[in-house]
Amino acid sequence: MGLSIHSLRKLKERAQPIVALTATEYAMARILDQAGVDLLLVGDSLSMVALGHTSTLPVTVDELLHHCRAVRRGVERALLVADLPFGSYEQSPQQAFSTATRFLKEAGVQAVKLEGGYPRMTETVAFLTESGIPVLGHLGLTPQAVHQLGGYRVQGKTAQAAERLIDQALALEGAGAFALVLEHIPYDLAGEISGKLVIPTVGIGAGPHCNGQILVTHDLLGLTENPPPFVNPYADLRALISKAVGRYSADVRAHGSREE
């Protein structure tokens, strides 16, 4: 039986870390699901790793839906969550609801992820959760606001900024978010937030004190040319693929094929 949003709460209660990764297509989603990943996110990071853009901003709702449908076919166990892309939910709770329902109805995801905190986003999260749509919050470095933040920088470094993030986390929990992603914030702050919340936190570049961890799978596997500084790849598939293609190319050019 597949995991639900309540399963993640139980993992936190048992002090069992949540394992989360991103997925963009069927084959990889199936591998990750069978490997026991708890949460799979079809993230707007696919704008960069799958579509070749330089930020998450250009990806559209229809593009993300296409990838979500492919990933859905490969997932049996993991909780499947989709990012709502930039420009598809910020205007109003009603706009967010209209977009989110497409992901649940057309792509079969179980929840959506929104970036940002109060006041506007807590109102939106409350509207969605009261309407039956589970929401994963996202605080700290929020890539959709990269221009406003002045780049991909650590957030919450000052006492005032840290206090604001704590308040936002509590507000999102109060609005009904089932979990929070904490990205690129000081490790001790991530631990403090995790301790104050009943809902689980999932960190990315936020240290070991969150209730789980998430990475972009392309970064984890060494497929990204320039991964974020906080990523320690667990494989070098870029080099492995290059070597395999090189061997194949050499065989074809020398013998026509390897079938003999």
Curated annotation (Swiss-Prot):
Enzyme class: transferase
EC number of this enzyme: 2.1.2.11
Pathway(s) the chain acts in: Cofactor biosynthesis; (R)-pantothenate biosynthesis; (R)-pantoate from 3-methyl-2-oxobutanoate: step 1/2
Keywords linked to the UniProt accession: Cytoplasm, Magnesium, Metal-binding, Pantothenate biosynthesis, Transferase
Cofactor comment text: Binds 1 Mg(2+) ion per subunit.
Gene Ontology biological-process annotations: pantothenate biosynthetic process
Pfam family membership, one: Pantoate_transf
GO molecular function term, any single one: 3-methyl-2-oxobutanoate hydroxymethyltransferase activity
Catalytic activity: 3-methyl-2-oxobutanoate + (6R)-5,10-methylene-5,6,7,8-tetrahydrofolate + H2O = 2-dehydropantoate + (6S)-5,6,7,8-tetrahydrofolate
GO CC terms: cytoplasm
Co-factor requirement: Mg(2+)
SUPFAM superfamilies: Phosphoenolpyruvate/pyruvate domain (SSF51621)
HAMAP family associated with the record: PanB (MF_00156)
Record's function text: Catalyzes the reversible reaction in which hydroxymethyl group from 5,10-methylenetetrahydrofolate is transferred onto alpha-ketoisovalerate to form ketopantoate.
Full protein name: 3-methyl-2-oxobutanoate hydroxymethyltransferase
Source organism of this protein record: Gloeobacter violaceus (strain ATCC 29082 / PCC 7421)
Lineage, broadest ranks: Bacteria, Bacillati, Cyanobacteriota, Cyanophyceae, Gloeobacterales
Gene: panB
